[in-house]
Amino acid sequence: MFKAIVMLNRREDLSREAFGRWWLDEHRPLVRQLPGLRRYVVNLVEEGPEEGGDGFAELWFESREAFDAAYATDAGKAVVADSMAHARSRLRYVVAEHE
């Protein structure tokens, strides 16, 4: 299983509350349209440093190839465009999960 974590920092003109509403109500439905997506979890920051991330998404795919293929589709391009329309920065991490 392949896992990526995406950290978004909201635009300065968006409150944390407005950013969270956008992510859950508008962005999450777009992400769920990604082909091959196995699981998607959104973690919104309620308390933390202002210079840190405002939200973290965890995405699981069967493989790196499936992840790359999903983001190469029109749905994937729409997800990235929507993210960047609401965030001042976006960082993506490929991670190995250990329990």
Name each model feature, range by range.
Residues 1-99:
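Macromolecular interaction modules
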